[in-house]
Amino acid sequence: MLMKQIVLIVVFVSPHVLFSLSISFQVINMNVCIIGGTLEALLLAMHYQEKGTVSIFEIDAELGLPISHPGRVLNPSIFNEYFSPQQIEFLKLSSNPDGWGCRWEWVMKHMTSVAASKGVNIYPRTRVLSMEQLHDCIRVITTNNERHQPTQFDADLIISTHEESTKPGRLQHVLDESLTIPFKEQEHIPWFGGTLLTLHHPYPSMPKPALTLSRSDGQTEVWWKGECPWIPPAGYLETCSGTLSSLVDDLSFDAIVQRVSDFIHSLE
C-alpha cells in the first residue's frame, strides 16, 4: 500500500512565531483535509483526489459565496481544461482591456460541481473544532450539519486556504498551526467591487477603477483598492468587498491556477 514516503519540513517566520512543521505523508492513498471553500481549495482537492481521499470543510452554506473576487480571466481557453461548453456559456465571457469579464459565482458553482463529480468530499456548513496529532495521522473534529455527516476525520495532510473573517461575531475554524500548512498568498489589502448596468457605464463622475470588467450579460464590474469611493446615482446592482492581493496581476483565474500549481510543486 505504501509505495513511497516523503518527509516535508516547512519553516514559517512571522513577527510573533517561529516554528517548524514536519509532516510525513503517503504519495498514494493519502487522506487530505482542506479548510476553506475557496477556488484554491477546489483546485488543490482535484489534484490530491488522484492520490487518495480529499475532504473540504467550509463554514458557509455554499463555497465561494458571498463573492469577493473579480470575475476575471486573461486566457479564457483555460476554462476548457475544467468546464464543458455549456458551463462556459454560463460564465458570460466578454473581452475588456483589463481581461475577460466573467460571472465569478458561476466559476465557483461549476468548479464545486466538477470537484464533487471527481469524488472530492465537500462539507458546507461545517466548522473545524479541533485537531490532534495521533501516532500516524492527524485527527480532525468538526461540527455536524443537517446531512448527518461524519464529525471525525483522520488526515495525513491538512492545508488551510481559509482567511480569518474580520466580521464581529463571525464563527471561525479552530486550527492548530503546528499541524496545518497554510496556502499563503501575497499580502492582502481591502478591495471594493460594484456591479452596474453596462449601458450606464462609464459615469462621468466615477473615479477610474483599478479593474473594469464588462460581461456579455449586460453588466459591468468595477473594482477599487480600499473602501467604496463612489456610488452611482441609481446604486449598484451588487457590491462585493474583501481582502485581496494588492497586485492586479494576481486577480484572475489564470493567476490562481498558477499559484496552486506552484504550491503543489513546493510540497513535492
List the predicted regions and their residue ranges:
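N-terminal Rossmann-like FAD-binding beta1-loop-alpha1 element of flavoenzymes
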Residues: 31-54
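N-terminal FAD cofactor-binding segment of flavoenzymes
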Residues: 47-52, 56-91
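Predominantly flavin-linked oxidoreductase catalytic cores and closely associated redox partners
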Residues: 122-233, 254
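Short beta-strand to alpha-helix junction loop
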Residues: 94-113
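A conserved FAD-binding loop/helix module that cradles the flavin
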Residues: 240-267
